[in-house]
């Protein structure tokens, strides 16, 4: 059985200046390019969902870490030409970390959020009586 440590979500947003025909052309070019980048990073179960002037992409990755994310972000950044930009979310499946990146015009910026591990605080919250209504 395959082990996938990371869930990846990408939201691509197209420029409002693109005509409908231009948007469809851009989308048709992005899908195989993004698929190649994700597959090179070990991505599986790649799913695209078109939603008007946005496209959502989801897949799973075998590992979790900057050594995987940074080359992936570099590849995606090369596709962002000002007519499309995206936001990327890497979620480690143990929910210990979230990596978030904004990608536009060939560059990317990231942030990492460390979530607290289950411990005294979360146990205390879990064991509290439910709030009264």
Language model: regions and residue ranges:
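Short, extreme N-terminal segment that most often corresponds to the first beta-strand
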Residues: 1-33
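Charged interaction segments
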Residues: 33-133
């Amino acid at each position: 059985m395959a082990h996938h440590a990371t869930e990846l979500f990408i939201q691509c947003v197209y420029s409002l200046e693109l005509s409908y025909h231009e948007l469809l052309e851009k989308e048709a070019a992005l899908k195989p390019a993004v698929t190649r980048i994700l597959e090179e990073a070990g991505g599986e179960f790649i799913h695209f969902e078109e939603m008007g002037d946005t496209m959502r992409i989801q897949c799973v990755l075998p590992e979790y870490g900057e050594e995987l994310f940074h080359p992936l972000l570099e590849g995606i950044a090369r596709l962002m030409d000002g007519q499309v930009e995206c936001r990327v979310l890497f979620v480690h499946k143990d929910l210990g970390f979230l990596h978030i990146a904004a990608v536009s015009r060939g560059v990317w910026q990231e942030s990492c959020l460390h979530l607290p591990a289950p411990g005294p605080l979360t146990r205390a919250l879990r064991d509290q009586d439910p709030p009264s209504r």
